[in-house]
Amino acid sequence: MSDAQDSRVGSMFGPYHLKRLLGRGGMGEVYEAEHTVKEWTVAVKLMTAEFSKDPVFRERMKREARIAGRLQEPHVVPIHDYGEVDGQMFLEMRLVEGTDLDSVLKRFGPLTPPRAVAIITQIASALDAAHADGVMHRDVKPQNILITRDDFAYLVDFGIASATTDEKLTQLGTAVGTWKYMAPERFSNDEVTYRADIYALACVLHECLTGAPPYRADSAGTLVSSHLMGPIPQPSAIRPGIPKAFDAVVARGMAKKPEDRYASAGDLALAAHEALSDPDQDHAADILRRSQESTLPGTAAVTAQPPTMPTVTPPPIQAAPTGQPSWAPNSGPMPASGPTPTPQYYQGGGWGAPPSGGPSPWAQTPRKTNPWPLVAGAAAVVLVLVLGAIGIWIANRPKPVQPPQPVAEERLSALLLNSSEVNAVMGSSSMQPGKPITSMDSSPVTVSLPDCQGALYTSQDPVYAGTGYTAINGLISSEPGDNYEHWVNQAVVAFPTADKARAFVQTSADKWKNCAGKTVTVTNKAKTYRWTFADVKGSPPTITVIDTQEGAEGWECQRAMSVANNVVVDVNACGYQITNQAGQIAAKIVDKVNKE
């Protein structure tokens, strides 16, 4: 991409000397830049004044930067730093020399099935790592997938999409490109979970195999309608030679209902691998192995001079476009071992925007003279062996075992803890259970923030309504009388499938996290109470949160929710010295489920 008019090439931005414009989009610009203090080359994204001044955008982007900076996943480009300079937000990340997948597909057409699966497997690994840390990408598409000459794949732009496409899809010219990969629930008021990313990844798989996105339309309305109601296309019917088994993989990944999709991106990738013929499975494994062995993300630099083009001519699909730099070894000043540090906030700017248009080199490891090349080289060898082993394991891992049979409804009561088990956890000796509970609580409770009702109480009818659950069994335990010091409500809820149970917990986690730090007013039986939520701990399959009652002399409760097989475990433990009692009870119930 040439330096467009009004670019800031050649100027200084804080400590950065902006050397080359890499991309420009609706949110700002991306530059190759030299950090003049640290003496390394990075990619810097500069946000527009509009986004830099948006307080909601600023806070969400800071949070996403810290999370993305923590992700220890080789297929996520590390974020080094973020902040603002003279009121303009920026993001510093590793400079990666590569070509985005969209440009590869447009220039060379569809990929071979083994190569498509190898790339999808790597992106699935990045997504699963993000989802485990509570991050949704929300803009998975070929333009945000970067491919090196060795087919090492990176997923870029974590956090930016989630902060700008939640409720601000107003620029039609920019948004339509994203809408090609957007899950149906993104166009409605339904809850959006991590499975929207899985839908998008299935769309990308379809495009890798056929050369075109699943739905193409001249208008946004037609495109949205296709995602909501259109039949899911079959890759084998579009491009001869694609194994028919891919039709089922894409169909499940693009299921209209989130709960009908794969439970994880890795599950989708594994199913895609299984759809290949045996020779093609070996080919995909070779691609993965080669990409892992030839790429050293985050290793220390061993050369101060710009790299030269390899003497061996790479395949044409992997060649860099005219005007782009030659392929560079993945080297730079980041430590060769140990975790990538969480990015620090730079007092002086902000965040960058994704580049628009064609191929773009993205920040690979910064280049800097290293006085310890032997040490760095040794560390690089260790890392490449580890990554190679990971690639081999991913490609050649054994076929998945059959999932366990769903727990029968009549077995639910046996999963609950007995009185001695509850007393042991709560530090009491006289707690006794009441009558068994076999239906949801439909008491006329009013919560000022309705979405927080599930974070406050167990087995609530409004919370579970419409989720498809099939049965519930629960027990409430406390000391005798009205002046009890401990109170526990434990419930187990059966769903038709494990996927539906996991989807419910994921949805609950999203709602609980939105309640963190907030105070709600509860009206129950003509009485009013105020409860304040602490931060949510953990991520699905297990989440917990402590809520404290105002004016109750330290009375507080811990909510815990977990899932095992097709059973959701829903626990509330209350008392005056609450730590993680609900979490312990949930864990013990999960152990029982797993033994069924």
Curated annotation (Swiss-Prot):
Primary site of residence: membrane
GO biological process, one term: regulation of primary metabolic process
Cellular compartment(s): Cell membrane
Active site location: D139 (proton acceptor)
Pro residues bias spans: 307-318
Extracellular side: 395-596
Signal peptide coordinates: none
Membrane topology (UniProt): Single-pass membrane protein
Residue numbers spanned by region Disordered: 292-368
InterPro entries the record matches: Kinase-like_dom_sf, PknH-like_Extracell, PknH-like_Extracell_sf, Prot_kinase_dom, Protein_kinase_ATP_BS, Ser/Thr_kinase_AS
Disulfide bond sites: none
Residues where ATP binds: L22, G23, R24, G25, G26, M27, G28, E29, V30, K45
EC class name: transferase
Transmembrane segment boundaries: 374-394
GO molecular function term, any single one: ATP binding
Post-translational modification: Autophosphorylated on threonine and serine residues.
Keywords: ATP-binding, Cell membrane, Kinase, Membrane, Nucleotide-binding, Phosphoprotein, Serine/threonine-protein kinase, Transferase, Transmembrane, Transmembrane helix
EC numbers, comma separated: 2.7.11.1
Reactions accelerated catalytically: L-seryl-[protein] + ATP = O-phospho-L-seryl-[protein] + ADP + H(+); L-threonyl-[protein] + ATP = O-phospho-L-threonyl-[protein] + ADP + H(+)
Cytoplasmic topological domain: 1-373
GO cellular component: plasma membrane
Family under the similarity heading: Belongs to the protein kinase superfamily. Ser/Thr protein kinase family.
Name of this chain's protein: Serine/threonine-protein kinase PknH
The organism of origin for this protein: Mycobacterium bovis (strain ATCC BAA-935 / AF2122/97)
